[in-house]
Amino acid sequence: MAEVLLFEALRDALDEEMQRDPSVLVMGEDVGHYGGSYKVTKGFHEKYGDLRLLDTPIAENSFTGMAIGAAMTGLRPIVEGMNMGFLLLAFNQIANNAGMLHYTSGGNFKIPIVIRGPGGVGRQLGAEHSQRLESYFQSVPGLQMVACSTPYNGKGLLKSAIRNDNPVIFFEHVLLYNLNENLIEQEYLLCLEKAEVVRPGNDITILTYSRMRHHVLQAAKVLVNKGYDPEIIDILSLKPLDMGTISLSVRKTHKVLIVEECMRTGGIGASLRAAILEDLFDYLDAPIQCLSSQDVPTPYSGPLEELTVIQPNQIIQAVEEMCKIE
């Protein structure tokens, strides 16, 4: 066992897969000589050279298209967005090409590409650099979406994403890179389509992902001391949703609280709520509650920035109110 930070776990995943498979390469702004904006590829340029660590111009649409073309020829490119918000400039490439080329080519082309990088609210990065793109990409056919939340699942999910023959959008939260955890030294992979039951419980199901997993766990400490028994599920796979794991929990607790950093309108929470109501309505004893970020641009001010996202005290209050419903 060794203590590893999240960005180090992601680096280890990339390093192991690049050693294992010479078709794996990384491209993006400052991923080579500089080692990436959050040092996830630090030292890789010296180890793997210019052909497998491609420093690109500031042209997201162009280098994402280049990566998709490389994937069509049999390579396994990993695109790093310096900030996930910048990938809006490559939306056409991701949606119309990465997501659909396998279908529109009649199955002749696989698109084994991973698009990863930092996003979310934090570090006072301002409105343009605090985007949550999961709401944008969830409706694009052909894309898988994963959000890591710990060094353990970050490493295991990224390795699986690289080996996957489908395009995967891999979300990393800017505030979680220095999160530490003891990891086993043996190689492991995690299923891209499986949620994690973080804490078993009987009173209420709390569905969450990414940074909000940790806000929920903070709230859970208080709730347990007050006598509540929440079941916490990190959904991990944003698309497709692991409705099997979610269904088992809802049938047991009969109450659902969704906690996300995504916007309330059109977010992952809205999709989760719709899926649960469609399949599990008869098992619910209370309306589904969804705690989401406000539908406003993220302020630069630190205190105002925090006010736009859900905090642990709001989770505690929501659980207490829902558990009063018989």
UniProtKB/Swiss-Prot annotation:
EC number(s) reported in the record: 1.2.4.1
GO annotations of cellular component type: chloroplast
Record field: transmembrane: none
Enzyme's top EC category: oxidoreductase
Cofactor(s) the protein needs: thiamine diphosphate
One Gene Ontology molecular-function label: metal ion binding
Reactions catalysed, as given in the entry: N(6)-[(R)-lipoyl]-L-lysyl-[protein] + pyruvate + H(+) = N(6)-[(R)-S(8)-acetyldihydrolipoyl]-L-lysyl-[protein] + CO2
Disulfide pattern: none
Database matches in SMART domains: Transket_pyr (SM00861)
Residues reported in the UniProt entry to bind thiamine diphosphate: E60
Localization annotation: Plastid, Chloroplast
Keyword Repeat: no
Keywords annotated in UniProt: Chloroplast, Metal-binding, Oxidoreductase, Plastid, Potassium, Pyruvate, Thiamine pyrophosphate
Pfam families: Transket_pyr (PF02779), Transketolase_C (PF02780)
Organism superkingdom: Eukaryota
Binding-site list for K(+): I113, A161, I162, N166
Protein function: The pyruvate dehydrogenase complex catalyzes the overall conversion of pyruvate to acetyl-CoA and CO(2). It contains multiple copies of three enzymatic components: pyruvate dehydrogenase (E1), dihydrolipoamide acetyltransferase (E2) and lipoamide dehydrogenase (E3).
Assembly behavior: Heterodimer of an alpha and a beta chain.
Name of the featured protein: Pyruvate dehydrogenase E1 component subunit beta
Source organism of the structure: Chaetosphaeridium globosum (Charophycean green alga)
Lineage of source species: Eukaryota, Viridiplantae, Streptophyta, Coleochaetophyceae, Coleochaetales
